[in-house]
Amino acid sequence: MDWNRIEGNWKQFKGSAKEKWAKLTDDDLKLIEGRREQLEGRLQERYGKAKDQVRQDVDDWLKTLH
């Protein structure tokens, strides 16, 4: 999945993001607005993971999207 597609259609994908990362709040999802760096930053804050691990988690999530 190309990130540009997610960014342009964030409303379609944010539900999937919320399912994957339940600690993300609705305000987080609104703030992210499809920007990968915002998503990764929020995931680091909410889950206390290292940047590299969060990046891998997001890459893995992308592979599940169609």
From Swiss-Prot:
It holds the Pfam family CsbD. It comes from Bradyrhizobium diazoefficiens (strain JCM 10833 / BCRC 13528 / IAM 13628 / NBRC 14792 / USDA 110). InterPro entries: CsbD, UPF0337_stress_rsp, YjbJ, YjbJ_sf. It comes from the Bacteria. Belongs to the UPF0337 (CsbD) family. Gene3D superfamilies: YjbJ. This is UPF0337 protein bsl1473.
